[in-house]
Amino acid sequence: LSFRENGKQQLIELIRQHYNHPSICFWGLFNELKEVGDNPVEYIKELNVLAKQEDPTRPTTSASNQNGDLNFITDNIAWNRYDGWYGSTPKTLATFLDRTHEKYPEIRIGISEYGAGASIYHQQDSLRQPSASGWWHPENWQTYYHMENWKIIAERPFVWGTFVWNMFDFGAAHRTEGDRPGINDKGLVT
């Protein structure tokens, strides 16, 4: 099978295997898809139609980290946003959400990932934003980050859903940030 045919077959198998699972709310078609090489827009449209044929009862969604036509194919769109962690401040999320909603009021907006790293060994009195790529990840910044992001999200009824990244710290061999190499330390629980 070609890459695209294989992807379609996997989507069919996924939906047929899990269509009756009580925790399935929607079918996700991509996460942080980068437009390198062939333009994926037509393929994502085909997957969207296929998902609807297999299960007309659930919406489709996608998780994006960029602008572009990809964001207008699925029923819902969610963005992976780390405002206040990878540069900027938590308030940047408010600006992003408000501008996106103003420009596209018909689109249902979600936040598919948001989070900040922390170490139980890193404590500080001041509220100073750390460098995400640095070794110092104080817990009080992670707490502030989540409190500020939640306020921003809760004040916007047009946001259909949010997903914290992540419940637990987890292994990620390529990570060299925080006080433990090979760990993504964005977990709410260490």
Tell me what each language-model feature is.
Residues 1-190:
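Extended substrate-binding grooves/exosites of carbohydrate-active enzymes
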